[in-house]
């Protein structure tokens, strides 16, 4: 049995025969594809914004400013000076304040509080828009056949993401344990799931952008080898995104600022200084940055191989998609080097993360077109 990947189209719809005289409900569902696609596009844009705001929240060390998890009542921020002072007093009970921010006044605390509150509030908005859209389409029976489960999935994953977000924050809301930030592996889990959700939304948008009949015909032209290679590239890119989260989680991007060497050496000094040994792969800044660097080189090398194969596609749109992937990855490699050599300032680090989103979506697009080519070849037939 062939392996299935997280974004592979496995719909049973392709097995259905189109009715010669579709009924009113079928026509209604077919017509709703555009509306559902717009709804997904709104969710997609909000998730991209969520990733950006989450990145800025981490880079500004704002993520621990709200020490409680109140999914509903937390939507209302402090409204009076007394309420603000109460929130500040809660923050003063955790290690981050005692070890990093004893200099803070209430006005300084408000700045980091708003970042974290905005991040959580955006999550609530995403959940609300998903629920309104999903149940609205469900009640009006506008969801195309076979799509109910698919459209339910982002909502379920969003709920899980909220729980993971608090699990992540809870790792840093400590006293006496020396934690000044969230656990890096929990941060990687949180960011990784955000990219998974974004991937599903993008894939569904690609599918709904074409008629079911067109997809059925296009699948007969599927480029199996290119599809498999792009799937591998997608998974490799996902791994690199997780490694990037580990780097951000422990500020490893600032540990060595020379390139191509690290501290004047190929391998960073004291790579296994933490006990037990396995913790170095998650908590040793030098080793974590080294792994992220090497993975980046390997990802780029593999991308070149995939790109060269993609250029041989018989379809112009597929060729263009793989050209775009190669261009975006080339840009990302350069930005990554600049990020290291400038000690990861916030403005460059957030651009690095934003381009990672671009690379992710472009790889998905190229993978989609290798599975469902647009039936116009480079020879014009």
From Swiss-Prot:
Location(s) in or outside the cell: Cell membrane
Keyword Methyltransferase: no
Membrane topology: Multi-pass membrane protein
Chain segments annotated as transmembrane: 36-56, 125-145, 151-171, 187-207, 230-250, 287-307, 320-340, 344-364
Top EC category: oxidoreductase
GO CC, one annotated term: plasma membrane
UniProt pathway annotation: Porphyrin-containing compound metabolism; heme A biosynthesis; heme A from heme O: step 1/1
GO biological process, alphabetically ordered: heme A biosynthetic process
Claim: Ligase is one of the keywords in the record: no
Entry's Gene Ontology molecular function annotations: metal ion binding; oxidoreductase activity, acting on NAD(P)H, heme protein as acceptor
EC number in record: 1.17.99.9
UniProt binding sites for heme: 292, 352
Pfam families in the cross-refs: COX15-CtaA (PF02628)
PANTHER family: CYTOCHROME C OXIDASE ASSEMBLY PROTEIN COX15, CYTOCHROME C OXIDASE ASSEMBLY PROTEIN COX15 HOMOLOG
Official protein name in the record: Heme A synthase
Native source species: Ruegeria sp. (strain TM1040)
Gene name linked to the record: ctaA
């Amino acid at each position: 049995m062939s392996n299935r990947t997280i974004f592979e189209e496995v719909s049973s719809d392709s097995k259905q025969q189109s009715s010669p005289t579709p009924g009113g409900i079928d026509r209604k569902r077919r017509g709703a594809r555009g509306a559902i696609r717009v709804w997904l596009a709104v969710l997609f844009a909000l998730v991209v914004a969520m990733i950006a705001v989450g990145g800025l929240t981490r880079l500004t060390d704002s993520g621990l400013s709200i020490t409680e998890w109140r999914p509903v009542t937390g939507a209302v921020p402090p409204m009076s000076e007394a309420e603000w002072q109460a929130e500040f007093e809660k923050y003063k009970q955790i290690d981050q304040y005692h070890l990093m921010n004893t200099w803070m006044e209430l006005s300084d605390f408000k700045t980091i509080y708003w970042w974290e509150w905005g991040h959580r509030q955006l999550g609530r908005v995403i959940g609300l828009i998903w629920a309104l859209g999903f149940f609205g389409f469900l009640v009006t029976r506008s969801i195309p056949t076979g799509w109910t489960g698919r459209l339910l999935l982002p909502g379920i994953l969003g709920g899980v993401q909220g729980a993971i977000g608090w699990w992540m924050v809870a790792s840093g809301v400590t006293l006496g344990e020396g934690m000044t930030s969230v656990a890096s592996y929990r941060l990687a889990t949180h960011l990784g799931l955000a990219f998974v959700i974004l991937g599903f939304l993008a894939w569904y948008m690609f599918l709904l952008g074409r008629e079911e009949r067109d997809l059925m015909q296009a699948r007969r032209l599927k480029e199996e080898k290119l599809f498999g290679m792009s799937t591998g590239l997608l998974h490799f890119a996902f791994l690199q995104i997780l490694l990037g989260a580990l780097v951000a989680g422990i500020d490893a991007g600032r540990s060595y600022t020379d390139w191509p060497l690290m501290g004047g050496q190929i391998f960073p000094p004291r790579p296994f200084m933490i006990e037990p040994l396995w913790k170095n792969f998650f908590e040793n800044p030098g080793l974590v940055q080294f792994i992220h660097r090497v993975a980046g080189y390997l990802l780029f090398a593999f991308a070149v191989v995939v790109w060269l194969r993609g250029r041989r596609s018989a379809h112009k749109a597929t060729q263009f998609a793989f050209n775009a992937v190669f261009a975006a990855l080339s840009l990302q490699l350069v930005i990554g080097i600049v990020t290291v050599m400038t000690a990861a300032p916030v403005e460059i680090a957030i651009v690095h993360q934003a381009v990672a989103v671009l690379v992710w979506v472009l790889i998905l697009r190229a993978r989609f077109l290798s599975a469902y080519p647009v039936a116009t070849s480079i020879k014009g037939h």
